[in-house]
Amino acid sequence: MATPTSVRIAGFRSLQALCAQRTVTRNFSLLNRPAPNYPGHIPLTPVERGVLAIGSAVGSLLNPRRGDLIATLGETTATPFFIYRLRDAMLSNPTGRRILRDRPRITSQTLSLPYLRSLPPNTVGYTYAAWLDREGVSPDTRSSVQYIDDEECAYVMQRYRECHDFYHAVTGLPIMVEGEIALKAFEFLNTLIPMTGLSVFAAVRLKPEERQRFWSIHLPWAVRSGLASKELINVYWEEQLERDVNELREELNIEKPPDLRDIRKKLREQKRAARRQQ
């Protein structure tokens, strides 16, 4: 029986064949650019894609809070193979195929946050809304995909992007840089999107105690859960809102990591207590 890990490894083995089939020769320049494949699409030459990838990688390393650069890095490094692998993972799953057919979007217009807040505290919907409120964020902050040529694959990237906050909610990881790096490490093992793996290098920007905590607590957690968990891109989150969140975690093989905000709060209290005793 295939495991989540073996399925993802099998995808790597088909890299050469997939790239040969799907990489399109793009004979255009700045003065001869083809028409976009979907609203908002910006076709890129290989040189442009490479420059954007390098620039966004350096920029996001210097400032991990630049969501626009992280989004650009995600798009420019996902082709020609990785976004197709993720799309194929959806095509091989009944729920994934339904998501591709329905093309749902996750915004404050498609989800009723007041309703989610009214659900029992143990539900997925309440957990998601409570996480948004706790972190002070909105589902409307995800930028639209621009640099992926294939229209269906562009939706796959958009879906991943809009589901990201659900990953935060079910793991409990906050949006601070330390929490984002931990979640990106988990996402890399689950999705194989290069940007998520490259984001781990931002750990060099953490304070020494944060970096030590990442290596000793959250990276081992990310490896365990990322390899064991099912493909999260195939979760129809809109249909899970009234489910028990712990049951869903168990079904997806997601281990909840230690609460990062609680860890940081206790450390601050310990430091204050130590200063008072001096």
Swiss-Prot record:
Targeting presequence: 1-28
Cofactors demanded by this protein: Zn(2+)
Pathway: Cofactor biosynthesis; ubiquinone biosynthesis
Subcellular location, principal: mitochondrion
Topology within the bilayer: Peripheral membrane protein
Subcellular location: Mitochondrion inner membrane
Stretch forming the signal peptide: none
E.C. number: 4.1.1.130
EC top class named in words: lyase
GO term, biological process aspect, one: ubiquinone biosynthetic process
Gene Ontology CC terms: extrinsic component of mitochondrial inner membrane
Catalytic activity: a 4-hydroxy-3-methoxy-5-(all-trans-polyprenyl)benzoate + H(+) = a 2-methoxy-6-(all-trans-polyprenyl)phenol + CO2
Source taxon at top rank: Eukaryota
This protein's UniProt keywords: Lyase, Membrane, Metal-binding, Mitochondrion, Mitochondrion inner membrane, Transit peptide, Ubiquinone biosynthesis, Zinc
One Pfam match: Coq4
Protein residues bound to Zn(2+): 164-165, 168, 180
Subunit composition and interactions: Component of a multi-subunit COQ enzyme complex, composed of at least COQ3, COQ4, COQ5, COQ6, COQ7 and COQ9.
Family statement drawn from the similarity comment of this UniProt entry: Belongs to the COQ4 family.
Name of the protein this chain belongs to: Ubiquinone biosynthesis protein COQ4, mitochondrial
Organism: Uncinocarpus reesii (strain UAMH 1704)
Protein's gene: COQ4
